[in-house]
Amino acid sequence: MVAGAEVMHQVVPLLEASFHRRCSVKGVDEVSPPVEEMSPEAASEAAIEVPELMVKAPVESLQFSPNIRSGSFADIGPRRYMEDEHIRIDDLSGHLGSLLMCPAPNAFYGVFDGHGGPDAAAYMKRHAIRLFFEDSEFPQALEEDESFYESVEKSIHNAFLSADLALADDLAISRSSGTTALAALIFGRQLLVANAGDCRAVLCRKGVAVEMSRDHRPTYDAEHERITECGGYIEDGYLNGVLSVTRALGDWDMKMPQGSRSPLIAEPEFQQTTLTEDDEFLIIGCDGIWDVMSSQHAVTIVRKGLRRHDDPERCARELAMEAKRLQTFDNLTVIVICFGSELGGGSPSSEQAPIRRVRCCKSLSSEALCNLKKWLEPNE
């Protein structure tokens, strides 16, 4: 007679094989725990358990939907005064309530890098919601379509120009105070970036930096040509020998009267993209970041940080600290927006199908166990 513990050790593989034939499960990853030795007394009451199986449930490819979460960090850097401001709203419809009907998820982010004092940037932060969504007749729609996004772009364009005029009308703000402005909006799978100035938005697409804005500086050929046509000039890399950017809100001491062509304008440039599983996160930063590092270097730092701790707030701080280490000479503001709950995507795709755990248990009576023993014994 074979000892009980030995019988148990032989039975487990037999039952596993039988289970696989009955279920005909495709794509099964199996983890088999070791079978512990048992006393003969315990063997008769033992329950033989099929090891836990990892079954990849067949699902249809799902349309990507961003799972938005973000973090930000701001630091005065080596400057005596802080002139940067920023806005971070991960749930825009939740923030605005009935004022907004738009495709979900939806979010709004803004970075304002002031110059000539903090007043213009502070004004933009204080009044951004009113300027962008309340006064601008922001379009209302629950479905994603081309006409909605065209209306959004037109509305944001008007908001930039309205903000510029508002800064001129506010007597509490110096006419020499101005600010760059970059706004990023997410509606459903669409990412829209509007920029006037040298803040920058950079998308990480499978680890590769994709710039979603262009720096409006005198060294940019298209801007240089426009400035010359308007009667302006570039001196030592500065617009009219004074300003390092060619687009900004405010700075009315440098702008022509309303209605006249001016070398310095508040007109935003737009870039739009449809987010996919390949799009991991977006970095928005002021020029204090980009003056000392490339877009790809910034993406690499944030990506490594997310792999270590998965915290966009910490990533924003780490990026700013890297800029300080590289001896930036400006204020620092960074926003990191992730599009998935984990690095590398949002909704599960067919290649990353959800895993379902299946446990199948079978207890054998003493009689059944004896029958198995007899069946396994060699014929004499």
Curated annotation (Swiss-Prot):
Enzyme Commission code(s) on record: 3.1.3.16
Family: Belongs to the PP2C family.
Domain (PPM-type phosphatase) ranges: 69-339
Binding locations of Mn(2+) 1: 113-114
UniProt cross-references to SUPFAM superfamilies, sorted A to Z: PP2C-like
Record text on cofactor binding: Binds 2 magnesium or manganese ions per subunit.
Binding site for Mn(2+) 2: 113, 287, 330
Top enzyme category: hydrolase
An example Gene Ontology molecular-function term: protein serine/threonine phosphatase activity
A UniProt-annotated Pfam family: PP2C
Cofactor(s) this protein requires: Mg(2+); Mn(2+)
Substrates-to-products reaction catalysed: O-phospho-L-seryl-[protein] + H2O = L-seryl-[protein] + phosphate; O-phospho-L-threonyl-[protein] + H2O = L-threonyl-[protein] + phosphate
A GO BP entry: signal transduction
UniProt key word rRNA processing: no
Gene3D superfamilies: PPM-type phosphatase domain (3.60.40.10)
UniProt xrefs under InterPro entries: PP2C, PP2C_BS, PPM-type-like_dom_sf, PPM-type_phosphatase-like_dom
CDD domains: PP2Cc (cd00143)
Protein name listed in UniProt: Probable protein phosphatase 2C 2
